[in-house]
Amino acid sequence: MVVVTGREPDSRRPDGAMSSSDAEDDFLEPATPTATQAGHSLPLLPQEFPEVVPLNIGGAHFTTRLSTLRRYEDTMLAAMFSGRHYIPTDAEGRYFIDRDGAHFGDVLNFLRSGDLPPRERVRAVYKEAQYYAIGPLLEQLENMQPLKGEKVRQAFLGLMPYYKDHLERIVEIARLRAVQRKARFAKLKVCVFKEEMPITPYECPLLNSLRFERSESDGQLFEHHCEVDVSFGPWEAVADVYDLLHCLVTDLSAQGLTVDHQCIGVCDKHLINHYYCKRPIYEFKITWW
């Protein structure tokens, strides 16, 4: 009787190892791609672009020369349109970039002829230049207002200890007080002082000449915390208290807050002898709606 089985004869060697032909067949046999993988496969050949390139930037349509997009080699646009990367097209055959195109025209104008945007669009175009990594445009925008002035302002704020932390504290305190009181606005006290050294009372100018020599141990007698919510200072720079107040209002307003402030007096903390604190205290009013 002949017994027929459904298995092919085992070609493996007695020691359990596969023959060289079996190993080669297993190694060379490619995996069969699924329909999903085949549908998302990208072209293997370099993508070719026409001399005049139609663009769709987030729904905004532009047309420019290929040489314009490749003007600066170390930019994202030059890399995208180098042929090394695949760029999808829309239904009309325009090359699509998934980015808001509101200010892409200013980017193109710089690439075409070196034109710069007006002041009111400098900040927005700067963000686009960062995204597309256009170094020459970034350099020129940084030398324009308001970015040039912002660099000077940040240099001053860099001397201010914990400026950002204290700014966030102002917002958080104002929010909590408004929520707790179910109020439209909240008020808080802020102390802003440039110098650590306390001064004598205003009504006794003669006492200004009576300052005594202080030792290091005496310094503790002058250290105290004014009864306020947040304090800023001291700092070493030409910029004064009013400059810092301007920075506070600017940065709070940039968060969409309505800010009012006024000086409501000074800290009258008595320290030692004829020395009082006299740091100015400001009331900040944060309106939420």
Swiss-Prot record:
Domain (BTB) ranges: 53-141
Keyword annotations: Cell membrane, Cytoplasm, Membrane
Signal peptide (from-to): none
One family name in Pfam for this protein: BTB_2
Compartments, record wording: Cell membrane; Cytoplasm, Cytosol
GO annotation terms (biological process): membrane hyperpolarization; protein homooligomerization
GO cellular component, one term: plasma membrane
Chief subcellular location: membrane
InterPro entries associated with the record: BTB/POZ_dom, SKP1/BTB/POZ_sf, T1-type_BTB
Location of region: Disordered: 1-40
PANTHER family recorded: BTB_POZ DOMAIN-CONTAINING PROTEIN KCTD7 (PTHR14499:SF122), POTASSIUM CHANNEL TETRAMERIZATION DOMAIN-CONTAINING (PTHR14499)
Function in brief: May be involved in the control of excitability of cortical neurons.
Record text on subunit structure and interactions: Interacts with CUL3.
Protein known as: BTB/POZ domain-containing protein KCTD7
Species of provenance: Bos taurus
